[in-house]
């Protein structure tokens, strides 16, 4: 079996259907004895250029280990799903399991913000010192 990195972009109006799509696509891979090494839902992001007059899309990243036939089946599913705006499947040499730069940036941003969007202790303390 080979390793693949898969990114697909979903129409922003269909964002609520993304968890079901992820479940369906991961099911296709696991039923064919494939392995999912990394799965990241990046959420809605700004597009670099408009696609079908849309400026945002819902991004999903998967790193999987599967047979070529399974990947072909997945690409066919992408092609016939109108909600999938774009998809990219790249073969990789090794399984990638570490968090992507996008996920790391989100985690860092969330940790600075603190629970429920509160400012961190450092930010609040810096304001007190400045006063």
UniProtKB/Swiss-Prot annotation:
Q: Which UniProt keywords apply?
A: Ribonucleoprotein, Ribosomal protein, RNA-binding, rRNA-binding
- Superkingdom of origin organism: Bacteria
* Gene Ontology BP annotations: translation
Gene3D superfamilies in the record, alphabetically? 3.30.70.60
Q: So what does this one do? A: Binds together with bS18 to 16S ribosomal RNA.
Per the record, the similarity remark reads: Belongs to the bacterial ribosomal protein bS6 family.
This protein is called: Small ribosomal subunit protein bS6
Q: Which organism is it from?
A: Shewanella baltica (strain OS155 / ATCC BAA-1091)
Q: Which gene is this protein's source? A: rpsF
């Amino acid at each position: 079996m080979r390793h693949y990195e898969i990114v697909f972009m979903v129409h922003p109006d269909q964002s609520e259907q993304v968890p079901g799509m992820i479940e369906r696509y991961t099911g296709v891979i696991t039923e064919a004895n494939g392995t999912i090494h990394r799965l990241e839902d990046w959420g809605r992001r700004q597009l670099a250029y408009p696609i079908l007059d849309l400026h945002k899309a819902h991004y999903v990243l998967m790193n999987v280990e599967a047979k070529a036939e399974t990947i072909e089946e997945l690409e066919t599913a992408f092609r016939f799903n109108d909600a999938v705006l774009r998809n990219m499947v790249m073969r990789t040499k090794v399984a990638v399991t570490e968090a992507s730069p996008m996920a790391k940036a989100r985690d860092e941003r969330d940790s600075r913000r603190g629970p429920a969007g509160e400012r961190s202790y450092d930010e609040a303390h810096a304001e007190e010192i400045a006063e």
